[in-house]
Amino acid sequence: MKKINHWINGKNVAGADYFHTTNPATGEVLAEVASGGEAEINQAAAAAKEAFPKWANLPMKERARLMRRLGDLIDQNVPEIAAMETADTGLPIHQTKNVLIPRASHNFEFFAEVCQQMNGKTYPVDDKMLNYTLVQPVGVCALVSPWNVPFMTATWKVAPCLALGNTAVLKMSELSPLTADRLGELALEAGIPAGVLNVVQGYGATAGDALVRHHDVRAVSFTGGTATGRNIMKNAGLKKYSMELGGKSPVLIFEDADIERALDAALFTIFSINGERCTAGSRIFIQQSIYPEFVKRFAERANRLRVGDPTDPNTQIGALISQQHWEKVSGYIRLGIEEGATLLAGGADKPSDLPAHLKAGNFLRPTVLADVDNRMRVAQEEIFGPVACLLPFKDEAEGLRLANDVEYGLASYIWTQDVSKVLRLARGIEAGMVFVNTQNVRDLRQPFGGVKASGTGREGGEYSFEVFAEMKNVCISMGDHPIPKWGV
């Protein structure tokens, strides 16, 4: 059986203990994975600390060259990495192969260029004084990445972190360890020096906790659940943090919207990536005048989505990450019905028409709950699965109030042709990102992140460097400015 070890200081390091990672679509054991803890984290942090001075002082152009080389290697291995990601996560192969893994390659290409444009500023005070700033790496960084789009998210952290001159310890979710192992291997193949990128496998409560608490770690970039993020900030001490946490993103569809395009986008935003995405438009608010027709058409199309083998290019909904997560999502569907929502598509049970080799898989049909009240738990709590909650609203004021009436504030989506309404809502909605008349279309130059319980800090473009860089001010006197004379 395949064994997944740690990558520490350029070496493939065996673990003292191992656990199994399984294919969520079939139940098949894919590999034995090293279960790291404090000892492995100490080794990795020490390696990163030792590698930091030389890496930080490497000419920026040389670091950029190595980043581009790593991006090229990923690009050359997209089919292999995509197949690995699909097997480990249950994500449909058409998404991993055509979108998510190519994005990972682009992350290195993009940040190789952006890091070379990071410059300090000068502040001439007068003819006697000059201030200027230096942009410098922070040192050893903890990168903690989630299971839902593991390879892309990991590279989104690794690329800006390393490009700026930091070194890193990457800890992936124990539910999706395979592609992180491949990333560690490709980094060495690209020529990135030993110790610059270390990959420690293991559980959050052991390896993850030891990593974020480590005294040599200067910055933590975490993507995951809100409860875990709060615990990290509470327990890890005085460090720099970037926290991309949970979401319960609203979609506001007004009666003057392009309904066909709004339907397309609303379905995609909640059901792509199996609904396991932080920016999922899981609360879909529809203006009362168009509510009945929109709900009918939305449910009809949800019922036609193809659920099945993630390796089939025609599959749109694959398997949820684990049996435990399946039970959580299924439980929320039952809860929504108990709370009074109307089930129009899907349901809490596995599809009955799965082929024999998928019977043990964690499959759920895309589920539509209509007539949801915004105070129901299914409308307030992050489900993180293919479950859409449909709610009516009367007018702009009520739509905005309902959209904001939740603890999260990551993404938001607005559908209207009224430009004045767009400008008012974009200012008033409590979210880190607002998408108008579109699904979530990302540009790497834009800031990605949320407000309220959805996190702190931003990733993307130069904003990624906020957690990975220190701004140092230098003040220089030209020689004869006045200095107070004390003790004369």
Locate predicted features.
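Conserved C-terminal structural/oligomerization subdomain of aldehyde/semialdehyde dehydrogenase
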Residues: 26-32, 217, 252, 306, ...
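ALDH superfamily catalytic-core signature
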Residues: 227-373, 436, 483-484
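Short, well-ordered beta-strand elements within core beta-sheets of diverse protein domains
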Residues: 29-36, 51-57, 143, 251-254, ...
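Long amphipathic alpha-helix in the N-terminal Rossmann-like dinucleotide-binding domain
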Residues: 46, 68-79, 93-118
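A short hydrophobic/small-residue beta-strand
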Residues: 167-169, 343, 433
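N-terminal alpha-helical segment of soluble enzymes
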Residues: 24-89, 289
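Rossmann-like NAD(P) dinucleotide-binding subdomain of oxidoreductase/dehydrogenase enzymes
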Residues: 120-261, 393
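Hydrophobic face of amphipathic alpha-helices that form TPR/SEL1-like repeat modules
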Residues: 1-25
